[in-house]
Amino acid sequence: MNNNQCMRKKLDELRNIARSYNISITGKKKQQLCDEIIDYQKNNPPRRSPSPRRSPSPRRISPECEQWLANKGINPRTGKAIKIGGPTYKKLEMECKEASPKIPSPVRQPSPVHSPVRSPVRQPSPVRFVEKTKGALNKMKKDQLIDFAQSLGLNPGKLLKPALVDLIFVNQKPPRRSPSPRRSPSPRRSPSPRRSPSPRPVFVEKTKGALNKMKKDQLIDLAQSLGLNPGKLLKPALVDLIFVNQKPVEPIRASSSSRSSRSTRRSSSTKPSRRSSSRSRRSSSRSRRSSSRSRRSSSRSRRSSRRSTSRSRSLSKRSIRNISTVGDLEDLVASNLPIAIPESLSRSLSPSRTDFHEAEIELGSDFDLNNLPENRIAELKQLNVLAKQNGFRMINVPLDGNCMFSVIGRAFNTSSSVIRQHTVDYLRRCKGSFDHIPANIDDPTINWNDYIDRLEEDACWGDNTALFAASLALNFQAHILQVAGGDEGSWIRFGVNETNMGRIVNMGYLDNFHYIALEPFSGRLDILSIPSTHSKCPPPEISNRRDEEIRRDEEVEDEVIGERIVREAEVIERELRQEEELTSIVSTKRSLRPSIPPKISTEHRRTPKLRPSVPRPSSIRQSQPNVAALARLETLTKIKDIIDALQRPLENKLSTLTNTEKAIMQCIGVA
């Protein structure tokens, strides 16, 4: 042991060594203990008795090489640390190899003492192979890693330690063993008739969050197990591909043609008569007709149920949806459903239409239809039919995660990175207007700062919020044609206002997959210019409530206002009735006075049965004062003041206002 090796050890280890050498350790520091231990080892070298069974092996290497092999990080000549893999390290390695070539040790023969009756010496059982984690590999030294790589049949070469760890971690598999010659393989047993084969594992569909947590290698294996071709897709595109198409691969069953051939063989073997064959044909044709009718009725019921239960029908009855405010964007993000189209357009897009070809789709060379799944190819062809019906042809952009920004940049004659930067700058400047909208529906823990930072990265997909922000930042309208619900299409327009009526960017959209540029057949549109000034932010005071809740609150407010008006009208009606009763009482009291004074006669005469010429005093009415008319005028002015005060909250509710006016007039008695 030299001084450097001694100083590298801990104080407790040195104290234990000193105790074994009977050296006192009280009050001594590390350097003093090292000096005494080294002196003791020099003066008292360890005595080793030669083994009687083995002759001492000749010394192969020099003491310097022994010290260097014991610790390859220290130069034995100078005692200083050296760099592993450096020039001094390589020089020492070459010297020690030349000075001491490796001599293979002779193989021991079994002892002749054993009798031939006994079984031969057993070889040690092979160590069970255990895959090591990356942390365990990092803790190993480089020499151990090199030996481990060679045992796995790998060529480490001159790789550094991190690359060597990755090489072993990826390729660590147990070596194949040849079958033992002593034991013949046992014959395969026939399956037991009592035990049925174990059922197949139940397929469980995974959510989008669970797919996002998986690694890309796991996603590729899952896609291949589902019969999909992942290709060179990025992780977001791979997640969407698996989420849309995750269905268990069904086993191949006998086709209808094979079944029919079997049935024909059976029928030919039985040889029925002509009458029975004609009857069977008639019954089969009838069954086919009934089955076709049942299929039609079931398809009609499915269509009707879809139309009645689908939320997209309740959202809008039109084929165009405008996204011009933050509230519209909030509804679009919350609904996350396609917009329905008129039935006339859906009839023209019947699924039986197959008269289009791949040559009609004008796509770039990078868009290979063979690498796409079948449902995406069908959706792409359907989008091509929709585009042609609307007077557009499809122009593809690269599938690199920047497709939305590339389509917009094509209209502005610039790159996708410029459009992305304008969008990110606008979102950072106007972040307060979008705070109430969730940044990510699948992962609510992501806040707006993380969302904007991710959106700034290259190959990050753009969503509805990014498209809305880009339309406001660059002052253009984004008209998007998409295939919604199989064979139905719809238009969605982002950023519609009066200032950008001529600045339109048309694009097609494959759901959760790709954006495609649309150009009219008449000619290419003019190239748009990027505005020099910053666009204004949307108003931040827009509430985060849905339109249905706002409409419900307005209806409740209208009902409360109408009830209050009816109560006030009833109070006014009661006052008018009381005033009319008072005026009628006053008028009747004044009319009790007779116009002709009666004559008093002492003689009792029988009254004649003639009708008097003078009318009765009770039937004579004097002219009443016009108090009720004045009261009506006062109440009408009061009602007019009430209507003027309530006119602003009821501007958009003309029907409610007219109904309340009619009720007021009926209560007053004017109508």
Curated annotation (Swiss-Prot):
Residues 36-62, 100-123, 171-203, 250-319, 589-625 are annotated as: Disordered. It is an enzyme of class 3 (hydrolase). InterPro entries: 2-cysteine_adaptor, OTU_dom, Papain-like_cys_pep_sf, Peptidase_C85-like, Rho-like_N. GO terms for molecular function: cysteine-type deubiquitinase activity. The keyword RNA-binding does not apply. Its EC number is 3.4.19.12. GO terms for biological process: DNA-templated transcription termination; protein deubiquitination; proteolysis. Gene3D superfamilies: 3.90.70.80. Keywords: Hydrolase, Protease, Thiol protease, Ubl conjugation pathway. Residues 392-521 form the OTU domain. The active site is at D400, C403 (nucleophile), H514. This is Putative ubiquitin thioesterase 232R.
